[in-house]
Regions:
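Hydrophobic pocket/interface hotspot
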Residues: 14, 26, 30-31, 38, ...
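A beta-strand edge to alpha-helix "cap/lid" segment located at domain peripheries
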Residues: 3, 60-132
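A general structural-boundary detector
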Residues: 1, 17, 42-45, 92
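A solvent-exposed, acidic/Ser-Thr-rich amphipathic alpha-helical stretch
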Residues: 4, 8, 24-82
């Protein structure tokens, strides 16, 4: 497979695991998809601990806040020397709004080590009781 094909497959796995409800399965996928020293920059302001475990907990909190959702690539995935950028759309719409965004990822040795996320039109509800 080409670098582009590998990147497309990795982006698909990355987006899909944000919908995985089973904690053990999600953490296993996170450990396969993201590098050990993974870094995420995102705009929600929700708690985000370091590394893969921090991402796992962050996704769990988002699922509590937003319910069932999936992400789909919207358009082409542009790749260049271990970097990729693409737009995405969240399904179903949240609170009547179609939530969209764009991400830039850096991949080293087949794993995502850096993710920069921009989210459009998302207003988060109050955190659930017991949420971090």
């Amino acid at each position: 497979m080409s670098e582009r094909d590998d990147m497309i497959a990795l982006v698909s796995r990355h987006l899909a695991l944000w919908s995985v409800k089973d904690d053990d399965l999600r953490l296993s996928e996170i450990n396969d998809v993201y590098g050990e020293e993974f870094e995420l920059i995102e705009p929600t302001g929700l708690p985000l601990g370091p590394g893969r475990l921090g991402l796992h907990e962050h996704i769990g909190l988002l699922q509590k806040l937003l319910g069932d959702f999936t992400f789909e690539v919207d358009g082409d995935i542009e790749t260049h020397h271990g970097w990729a950028t693409y737009a995405w759309v969240q399904r179903p719409p949240y609170n009547g709004r179609t939530v969209t965004g764009r991400e830039v990822i850096h991949v080293v040795d087949g794993r995502i080590v850096f993710l920069f996320m921009v989210i459009h039109d998302l207003e988060l509800p109050e955190r659930p009781a017991g949420g971090a």
